[in-house]
Amino acid sequence: MNTTPDMPTPRALRELTPLEARILGVLVEKQHTVPDTYPLSLNALTAGCNQKTARSPVMNVSEDEVTTAIDSLKHLSLVMEGSSSRVPRFEHNMNRVLGIPSQAIALLTILLLRGPQTAAELRLNSARLHGFADISSVEAFLDELAARAQPLVIRLPRAAGARENRWLHLMCGEVNVADFVGPDTGGGTDSVPPSEFEALKAEQKRLADEVARLNALVQRMATELGIDVDAPGDAG
């Protein structure tokens, strides 16, 4: 799985912003999924950044914000602007700048667009970018990306209750692993966030109060009608 002899020497890069990372992911994705419209116009690139499906997190950015991020990526040689069209169009240059093969680019792209993924999820979600024969081949490329002098991905510890480890990109810098693994509950089950737990307690109290109010209403109506609601019903 090593890079070929003619693969460019990887360059050291600064940390990317979340929007810069999203732009790179969109450019690679659309290069494979809609090749007829690639390189992308600013409008198409912005739409891809704000896409609601296959994105985590979902963004809502303007063309001005995308333009600013593109200019920064140009300085890093990660994005190039075509000159053959009256409408500016943009393409990525990740293979040459990062010095990694297309298979690794495909995996990195999915992580840029969708957030943490297991190797199985990466194989499934990258199918339109590259067809991996099996999960072990996916893991081999991921291991290479993680073993670089400047690692591009990290393998997260297995979360409580999870069957597989997830992988996360490091294009935006080092991460706090605990933010993605979550607390160990010791019981192998997913933990409930404190805010959700408080909401459940409030809902439980509201329902209990409603039941008490209805019981009082029934008792009052029964008294007015002379009915003993505690008496057993007729057997026959």
From Swiss-Prot:
InterPro entries assigned: DUF480, WH-like_DNA-bd_sf, WH_DNA-bd_sf
Domain of life per record: Bacteria
Region forming the signal peptide: none
Disulfide partners: none
Family as reported in the entry's similarity comment: Belongs to the UPF0502 family.
Protein name (database record): UPF0502 protein Bamb_4889
Organism listed in the record: Burkholderia ambifaria (strain ATCC BAA-244 / DSM 16087 / CCUG 44356 / LMG 19182 / AMMD) (Burkholderia cepacia (strain AMMD))
